[in-house]
Structures are given as C-alpha cells and as structure tokens.
Design a protein with these regions (language model features):
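Helix N-cap/beta->alpha junction signal
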Residues: 6, 30, 48-50, 86, ...
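Acidic (Asp/Glu)-rich catalytic clusters
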Residues: 14-18, 38-39, 57-66, 95-105
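Residue-level signal for inorganic ion chemistry
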Residues: 6, 37, 71, 109, ...
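Active-site-adjacent beta->alpha loops and helix N-cap segments on the catalytic face
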Residues: 10-16, 34, 48-65, 117-128, ...
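Structural preference for beta-strand elements that scaffold enzyme active sites
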Residues: 20-24, 42-44, 66-72, 105-108, ...
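Active-site loop/helix belt of alpha/beta enzymes
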Residues: 75-184
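Glycine/small-residue-rich loop that forms an oxyanion/phosphate-binding "nest" at active or ligand-binding sites
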Residues: 13-48
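Single conserved hydrophobic/aromatic residue that forms the stacking wall/gate
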Residues: 1-12
Length: 184
C-alpha cells in the first residue's frame, strides 16, 4: 500500500514490468486481436479453430518468432464452449500442422469441463481429454518434447483435473474472488 493509493503509474515501461514475466492468454481469442498479443505472449491456451491458427501463424511470421499454443478441445456438454472436436484435432495434427504452421509450436491441449455439480460428467470429460493428450503425445504428429501441457481445471473442478493429469489449472476465481462487472 503506497499511502493509500490504488492507482500507480510510471513513464518508463521497462520499470513497470519485470523482464521475466511469462504472459499466458487463457480466454477466447478473436482473430482481430491476435496482432496485439503475438509480439509478447508466451503461451496461447485457447486456439479453437484452424482459422485462428492461421492468423497466429501469419502474425508470428511478421514478428519473426514462434508462438507456443495449446489446442482447445470441446469436451463439455455446453454449446457456449469453443474448440476442436476430438476428431478434428486428430485430423489437424495428422495433416502436417508443423509444416503448415512453422511459426506455431503446438505444446499441448486445453479443455473446459461442463459447468455442473455432476462429478461423474466432469470426470468423463477430463478423462476423454487426457486420453486424447496421451494418444497425440505418443504419435509422430507432434514434437513430443514440446507437447507436454494439458490445461484443464478451473476453480470449481481443478482437483478432478489434477487427478486426470492436468499440468496447468486456471484458478483466478479461487485467488481473486468472483469477477465483478460494473456499468459506466
């Protein structure tokens, strides 16, 4: 607490942020926003379509860098969730994605379970995602040394996700509390 102030500023960007921050993008990413994050992002968790993958490839090529990404897999019983189906993920990876997208490194999979109290449903969805992860990692369609992340589990279901092999969890609500949206 700096004398009660909540808003702080600095004129020098390099002094505001540590140089070793690794920025992960975890939400739904619109194609028109890719150009704003590709120059600095460490990992995009939510690549949910080939169209988005193509835009990331194009923007990463312009920056002369390789962007690490996770393919979002739609395993939930909710239409509001995004992502590749299990089969469309297999097709993408078997189709030579590393040659088609040289500025993108597929580092794993991400998925969100159905928002429910039914733990059996959540277990089935996490189990299906883990099975796909193991299948892909064991295939020749990815670089198995880079393909090591399985991002699943949020504040309400992360213990189940960890039991199913999750390497990354999204637990902002547990840390910061429910998000409050305000009207201006």
């Amino acid at each position: 607490d700096v004398l009660g102030s909540r808003g702080l500023g600095d004129v020098y960007k390099r002094q505001v942020l540590p140089k070793d921050i690794e920025w992960h993008f975890i939400g739904h990413l619109q194609t028109n926003k890719v150009k704003y994050i590709v120059p600095f992002i460490t990992l995009i968790h939510s690549v949910d379509s080939e169209k988005l993958l193509s835009v990331i490839e194009s923007e990463a090529a312009k920056c002369g860098r390789v962007v690490d990404c996770l393919l979002e897999i739609h395993v939930a019983q909710e239409d509001s969730k995004y992502g590749f189906t299990l089969d469309s993920c297999r097709e993408l990876l078997q189709g030579g994605s590393s040659e088609k997208y040289p500025h993108v490194r597929i580092c794993g999979l991400m998925g969100m379970a159905t928002q429910t109290d039914d733990e059996d449903c959540i277990e089935r969805e996490f189990s299906a995602l883990k099975k796909l992860f193991d299948e892909v990692k064991g295939s020749s369609s990815v670089d198995s040394s880079a393909f090591c992340e399985l991002s699943m589990g949020m504040s309400h279901d992360y213990p189940l996700a960890l039991r199913h092999g999750s390497t990354l969890v999204r637990i902002g609500t547990s840390i910061f509390g429910e998000r409050v949206y305000s009207c201006f």
